[in-house]
A protein has these predicted regions:
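Charged, low-complexity surface patches
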Residues: 45-46, 92
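Short polar catalytic/cofactor-binding loops
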Residues: 43-45, 70
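Short, basic phosphate-binding NTP loop
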Residues: 1-41, 48-60
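ATP-dependent carboxylate-amine ligase catalytic core
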Residues: 28-35, 56-149
Length: 149
């Protein structure tokens, strides 16, 4: 009985590991399909800058998706319309994955993502794993948030 339980634990662990590796590979492929990836960071004004940059890229003829966070959490679609995406779920930096996949599947030329991470480790993960920006914008760095940027 112990061997069966041990075997089940090992098999389940292997399955979870394989799923994680596959998810990372699929996410990286989706990121590579989007040539321009902008991440907006800072202490104030991130949502406004995200919206402005996305509008400018759309105006330049690029198929652009954008994602804002906070009180105005929305996906901004290539036609400029908005789609609420969180709907009472807790905030999580992993929410970049479905956004990037959908934008890539739609043939996006660019994405503009408002950085939602507060802690340094999550900021690193946003940049290095979830967005891999080709352009980073820092709106400002005020003293009340300086340790988090």
């Amino acid at each position: 009985m112990k061997n069966l339980a041990y075997s089940l634990i090992v098999a389940a662990s292997g399955a979870f590991l394989a799923a994680g590796v596959a998810e990372k590979a699929l996410h990286r492929r989706a990121l590579r399909a989007i040539p321009i990836r902008v991440m907006v960071n800072g202490t104030r004004g991130k949502t406004s800058v995200t919206r402005l940059v996305a509008a400018a890229l759309r105006e330049a003829g690029l198929r652009t998706w954008a994602k804002t966070t906070g009180t105005q959490a929305a996906w901004i679609l290539p036609d400029g319309s908005e789609q609420e995406y969180r709907k009472k779920r807790p905030v999580n930096i992993r929410e970049q994955i479905p956004f990037v996949r959908r934008a890539a599947r739609d043939g996006a030329d660019a994405i503009v993502v408002e950085c939602m991470a507060l802690h340094p480790e999550n900021q690193r993960m946003m940049a290095e794993e979830f967005v891999r920006p080709t352009v980073e914008i820092i709106t400002n760095a005020r003293v009340d948030h300086i340790s988090e940027i």
